[in-house]
């Protein structure tokens, strides 16, 4: 079993409303926003804040994201493994000559990793 946490470059009220109305709020133990952390992805600070709130370490964490220059680069900056959910192409993407730890093309493929 995994704990899910959310890191978003959004405002507290907006992100919590989205989670509530989508029915996803109960799945996430911690929700870290750029507003609450005073930092934006891909900066390491928002990830460090999330680690502190979740009482987690980079070594036991993984970032699942669909934006290579925000989610994946942020995870690389924070020293955690990443899963790039690539909805745009069927070719793996890189950022700053670095490849994500994993690339999937649909959320269903996450089952193969976890």
Please state what every model-predicted region is.
Residues 3-114:
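Asp-based, Mg2+/Mn2+-dependent phosphohydrolase catalytic module
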């Amino acid at each position: 079993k995994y704990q899910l946490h959310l890191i978003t470059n959004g405002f507290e009220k907006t992100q919590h409303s989205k989670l509530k109305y989508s029915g996803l709020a109960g799945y996430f133990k911690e929700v870290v926003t750029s507003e609450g952390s005073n930092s934006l992805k891909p900066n390491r600070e928002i990830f460090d804040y999330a680690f502190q709130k979740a009482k987690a370490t980079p070594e036991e964490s993984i970032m699942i994201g669909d934006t290579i220059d925000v989610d994946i680069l942020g995870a690389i900056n924070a020293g955690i493994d990443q899963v790039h959910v690539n909805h745009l192409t069927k070719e793996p993407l890189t950022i700053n000559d670095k490849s994500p730890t994993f690339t999937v093309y649909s959320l269903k493929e996450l089952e193969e990793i976890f």
